[in-house]
Amino acid sequence: MQKFLGVLTILVCVFGGYMWAGGKLGAIWQPAEFLIIIGAAAGSLIIGNPPHVLKEMRQQVPATIKGPTEEYEYYMELMALLNNLLETARSRGFKFLDSHIEAPEQSSIFLMYPLVSEDHRLISFITDNLRLMAMGQMSPHELEGLLEQEIEAIQNELLLPSRSLQRTAEALPGFGILAAVGGIIITMQAIDGSIALIGYHVAAALVGTFIGIFGCYCGLDPLSNAMAQRVKRNMTAFECVRATLVAYVAKKPTLLAIDAGRKHIQLDIKPTFNQMEKWLAEQEG
């Protein structure tokens, strides 16, 4: 809703102001200029990015526009899942968790928490590191270093689409100038025409510059920024898992290990310790 409000504000202010000053919307509709700018931008994205980055971009763009949903419930489920796994490991040993770790999509434990189970990247992170913990003794410091490196690698990978889109946004004014230069060439070919005809062609050429600047600063630039912020916000779940597992390896009680992870959750959705404790008690009950 917030993003749609932002888009509406941009459209009303930019085009409303243009019309208020006496401009006509029909003059901005220049399909050839749009084709040049959008085609050049799309082509540069395809040339400059491997397929997996483009695929991730196709997933991130609609998710960013849609906005976050059920974040509070997601983190409550995450803490309950970690509590369930670590309590089981403490009471029955990691050997008991082997079947759950190897096939989380079929695990009765993981399937209890559908919001988290849908996040395949996070589930893979949890199972891989539980497997690592089960293989042998590892100091909290060693585990923390490994987890930090893995989280950094995941974040850098997930930020590639937003960075690529940001570079494309920066190039849009240039693509707009490209379209405008093409329009000027057409204008010069009609230089012996009437003043009205020349004015029409010049106006059409300037639309390219207008659309390039508009697309950059009112479109792709804020979208790429929102995508980057979404990735960094989603990485909180990984930080939560990291802090929990490190605290567990440091021999902290399970509840305190879960609380170590809770402290990494964003303030606007972070439950209090009492809320977390009550939720975990209800899940165990």
Curated annotation (Swiss-Prot):
Keywords assigned by UniProt, alphabetized: Cell inner membrane, Cell membrane, Chemotaxis, Flagellar rotation, Hydrogen ion transport, Ion transport, Membrane, Transmembrane, Transmembrane helix, Transport
Main location: membrane
Cytoplasmic side: 223-285
Transmembrane residue ranges: 4-23, 34-51, 171-191, 201-222
Location within or outside the cell: Cell inner membrane
An example Gene Ontology biological process: chemotaxis
Keyword Transmembrane helix included in the entry's annotation: yes
Stored PROSITE patterns: MOTA (PS01307)
Membrane topology, as annotated: Multi-pass membrane protein
Upregulating conditions: Under conditions in which the polar flagellum is not functional.
Segment forming the signal sequence: none
Gene Ontology CC terms, in alphabetical order: plasma membrane
Annotated family: Belongs to the MotA family.
Function: Required for rotation of the flagellar motor. Probable transmembrane proton channel.
Protein name: Chemotaxis protein LafT
